[in-house]
Amino acid sequence: MDGNNVDPTGGCPVMHGGNTAMDKPVTKWWPNALNLDILHQHGARTNPMDPDYDHRAAVKALDFEAVKADVKALMTQDQDWWPADWGHYGGLMIRLAWHSAGTYRMQDGRGGAGSGNIRFAPLNSWPDNASLDKARRLLWPVKKKYGNALSWADLIILSGNMAYESMGLKTFGFGFGREDIWGPETDVYWGSENEWLAPSENRYGDLDDASTLENPLAAVHMGLIYVNPEGVNGQPDPARTAQHVRETFARMAMDDEETAALTCGGHTVGKAHGRGAVDNIGVEPEAAGIEAQGFGWSNPRHDGKATNAFTSGIEGAWTTHPTQWDMGYFKLLFGYEWQLTKSPAGAWQWEPIDIKEEDMPVDPTDPSKRHQPMMTDADMAMKVDPIYNEICQKFMADPEYFADVFGRAWFKLTHRDMGPKACYIGPDVPAEDLIWQDPIPAGSTEYDVAAVKARIADSGLSAADMIATAWDSARTFRGSDKRGGANGARIRLAPQKDWAGNEPERLAKVLGILEPIAAETGASVADVIVLAGNVGLEQSIKAAGYDVDVPFAQGRGDATADQTDAASFDVLEPLADGFRNWQKADYAVSAEEMMLDKAQLLGLTAAEMTVLVGGMRVLGVNHGNSKHGVFTDRAGQLTPDFFVNLTDMAYSWHPVDGENTYEIRDRATGAVKWTATSADLVFGSNSVLRAYAEVYAQDDNAEKFVRDFVAAWTKVMNADRFDLAA
């Protein structure tokens, strides 16, 4: 050692080999590489619970009434480090619950409150979520007390419910059962912007046409939940804002009445905070120093008084009595004329003209003072827009009706991504079946499975038809909001029976044979569809020389048209299916990216996606009987031929001009052996997927391939069987 290797800057002398910074991912060199990480983000390696931990069993053992009582009591337990407005944290907790649930969007089912994702980046640091870091810390004593059984996801939503209860509203109900994740969601696309609150033009085709908001987004800016409270791009215009309110709420499956109820009911309590200059507010939690311990948005003006808090920059309460559920929102909004003004922080807001002193809310900490109430541009939209105005007039005339509509809309908002009612736990689950829950009647478990299988095997249906139909029925499942799947057999109902991806003519033929079998044996059509897929699969396994049973769990039910909101299922229509090598049209997004997205929604790992694609190809179940990717001379047998031939260097691969297809040619003769799409060749091109492909191409893994395919197939068929774990 001559000292030449000494760091002259005084840096750490230890060689750091770990890539611990977020700005140094492996893919930084190849930004267009397929991001397989989205398939492995919430596995056992990130979960601190014991392998045998049963969260649903733990939840069922909770003392629900004690939990609710503790959360309700917390509302008025004022803390010096973050004082409550008027000594009541209700408004803050409602905002926490709302902003946790309000990220849900129906286009892909992502977002929402079901996983406690608001604890993690980027949501925990969105500008719209300022001060919610404090709300979560206020809840920590309750979370600490009840431990694993009370997830953050449940506690956050429960806090909103109990806030309303403590302020006089009887809520519609509550379901426990959400399970926490342990890190950021990397599969969710929140927008392409690299700047908080970047101009809305970045995500609209035409800002004057709210419907041109980029799919699947449901917020007007990066970092906001819905709309800009000051107006479109921060420019007040209630009529224009109304159109964006309508579009953003519609994208989370709310109609006009639900939207008006949530807006008015959400702003019946609490206040906005805008004392001080935004330039004086500190950075968000993810950017704050280590000594901040997860807190962000430090406020040098905050002197321990709620009056001086800063959150959105808008300042004031909406109603005269912000800690009471009443009709005060309507009284002020429609009882006064309003004029545009600015908050102390310089944000646009509206204030009433010539308001009576008794209608002014008192100061949050000094009851001897009163302040002007305020309305945001979105609130004024409820008055200016004729449709919202008419709805509000109906609410004003019937307070009980308003409370009921709001209670139901709030329940929908906070439970939309929990899935069917079988996922709910606790004494406050409403008995009523709600159509947005996609209700399914209980199915039979009394019929003879072996007898039904025999009937199916003798039906004359081909293995390919049975496998394809079962797959099409099950592939609609989305783990994001737990919608879709084979249970309910909605593939036989509108709109699914007419989807291009389901090959309507072939589907009608198959259902015409399977439905009578179901009727005659006492099985549900849903069960028979899946069982037929299993029969076809077992036939293909036997043809390949193996004897492997495909597991089956009976008990699926058949939904009716009356139990199905057909329009709400439009978003589940597959635009592409890499597993059946099909896409409806040419898209800017590649076939392999769409396949990856579908695999993530199905809850598959990269290995499961790989084995399923390879197996589906050789089974000959491509959409429209396409031959792309069928790398075998014995189609219909469940063999690893797809992988064997993909990795065989006797062949070369060549793009076909003007098409998203490729030719696989014999290197020696130049003859075309097979054709393929990018959804096929990616398994040889991507280094990670090739590693999996090589496993199944090995001589010693032919039977493993069959077993792994069956396991992955069964996982998809049972993805929506929440009743099995209830």
UniProtKB/Swiss-Prot annotation:
<dbReference type="InterPro" id="IPR000763">
    <property type="entry name" value="Catalase_peroxidase"/>
</dbReference>
<dbReference type="GO" id="GO:0046872">
    <property type="term" value="F:metal ion binding"/>
</dbReference>
<dbReference type="GO" id="GO:0005829">
    <property type="term" value="C:cytosol"/>
</dbReference>
<feature type="cross-link" description="Tryptophyl-tyrosyl-methioninium (Tyr-Met) (with W-98)">
    <location>
        <begin position="226"/>
        <end position="252"/>
    </location>
</feature>
<feature type="site" description="Transition state stabilizer">
    <location>
        <position position="95"/>
    </location>
</feature>
<dbReference type="Pfam" id="PF00141">
    <property type="entry name" value="peroxidase"/>
</dbReference>
<protein>
    <recommendedName>
        <fullName>Catalase-peroxidase</fullName>
        <ecNumber>1.11.1.21</ecNumber>
    </recommendedName>
</protein>
<comment type="subunit">
    <text>Homodimer or homotetramer.</text>
</comment>
<keyword id="KW-0349">Heme</keyword>
<comment type="similarity">
    <text>Belongs to the peroxidase family. Peroxidase/catalase subfamily.</text>
</comment>
<feature type="active site" description="Proton acceptor">
    <location>
        <position position="99"/>
    </location>
</feature>
<dbReference type="GO" id="GO:0004096">
    <property type="term" value="F:catalase activity"/>
</dbReference>
<feature type="binding site" description="axial binding residue">
    <location>
        <position position="267"/>
    </location>
    <ligand>
        <name>heme b</name>
    </ligand>
</feature>
<dbReference type="InterPro" id="IPR002016">
    <property type="entry name" value="Haem_peroxidase"/>
</dbReference>
<keyword id="KW-0575">Peroxidase</keyword>
<keyword id="KW-0376">Hydrogen peroxide</keyword>
<keyword id="KW-0479">Metal-binding</keyword>
<keyword id="KW-0408">Iron</keyword>
<dbReference type="InterPro" id="IPR010255">
    <property type="entry name" value="Haem_peroxidase_sf"/>
</dbReference>
<dbReference type="GO" id="GO:0020037">
    <property type="term" value="F:heme binding"/>
</dbReference>
<comment type="function">
    <text>Bifunctional enzyme with both catalase and broad-spectrum peroxidase activity.</text>
</comment>
<dbReference type="InterPro" id="IPR019794">
    <property type="entry name" value="Peroxidases_AS"/>
</dbReference>
<dbReference type="GO" id="GO:0042744">
    <property type="term" value="P:hydrogen peroxide catabolic process"/>
</dbReference>
<feature type="cross-link" description="Tryptophyl-tyrosyl-methioninium (Trp-Tyr) (with M-252)">
    <location>
        <begin position="98"/>
        <end position="226"/>
    </location>
</feature>
<dbReference type="GO" id="GO:0070301">
    <property type="term" value="P:cellular response to hydrogen peroxide"/>
</dbReference>
<keyword id="KW-0560">Oxidoreductase</keyword>
